[in-house]
């Protein structure tokens, strides 16, 4: 489910659930957390995360999304990628939706194909992302694009993501992983203590990614709402949801 490959000081981690477009469940999160912990313990210089079968990650597996343990594991993974002492890179093709976009913005560097798709479609289901994601996304793309993605459930192609700064580099279809590993090799040759210090400074410049009382209230209201149940039911029944704001 989670494949790892060492290439010198670069570690490639691949989410391998192509039948689910690499949607995350508990096992996938456990595997990713284990791969990250092993990279930290092994002295890896750059960690590259990608997905198998033409997709990065299509989000959370909706059979586990309501589980508090899943949410806690996902946050641990995102924060671990953000705060790892070495640079982390997302190599994105196909769908990077919901938790897929969260994984991407947790990484320091992002490379994608022009046809990749980024988005946070929580509003289509009655879900709500945490304050960590809202803050990190806004820092990556700016308030205007973040509001379009979060309030209007708009998606960004890889090409558009490159234009707005969500993606740093583009790679041709079929050459993504090779391009990502080539870039990672370049990054791995730089001074690791300089990189570690720069990450600390950049992360501190983002400010507190924790919960404010107002956001926690709004978040918990969304997650305990009838609209959430309606959104999940509509998804399972493959029909449009009928949200009532309650």
Where are these regions (language model features)?
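Glycine- (often His-adjacent) and acidic-residue-rich active-site loop
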Residues: 51-81, 96, 126
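Hydrophobic alpha-helical membrane-association signature
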Residues: 28-32, 70-73, 103, 176, ...
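Terminal peptide-recognition signature
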Residues: 13, 17, 31-32, 49, ...
């Amino acid at each position: 489910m989670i494949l790892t490959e060492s290439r010198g000081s670069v570690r490639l981690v691949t989410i391998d659930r192509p039948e689910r477009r690499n949607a995350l469940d508990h096992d996938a999160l456990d595997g990713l957390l284990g791969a990250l912990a092993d990279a930290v313990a092994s002295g890896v210089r750059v960690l590259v995360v990608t997905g198998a079968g033409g997709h990065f990650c299509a989000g959370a597996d909706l059979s586990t999304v309501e589980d508090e343990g899943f949410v806690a594991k996902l946050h641990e993974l995102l924060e671990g990628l953000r705060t790892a002492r070495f640079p982390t890179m997302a190599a994105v093709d196909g769908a990077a939706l919901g938790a897929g976009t969260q994984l991407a913005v947790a990484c320091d560097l992002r490379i994608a194909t022009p046809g990749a798709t980024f988005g946070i479609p929580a509003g289509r289901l009655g879900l709500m992302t945490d304050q960590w994601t809202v803050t990190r996304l806004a820092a990556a793309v700016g308030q205007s694009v973040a509001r379009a993605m979060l309030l209007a459930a708009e998606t960004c192609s890889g090409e558009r993501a490159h234009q707005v700064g969500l993606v740093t580099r583009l790679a041709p279809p079929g050459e993504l992983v090779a391009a990502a590993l080539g870039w990672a090799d370049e990054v791995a040759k730089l001074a690791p203590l300089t990189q570690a210090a720069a990450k600390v400074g950049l992360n501190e410049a983002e400010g507190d990614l924790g919960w404010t009382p107002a956001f926690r209230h709004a978040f918990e209201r969304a997650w305990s709402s009838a609209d959430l149940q309606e959104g999940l039911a509509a998804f399972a029944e493959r029909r449009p949801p009928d949200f009532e704001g309650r």
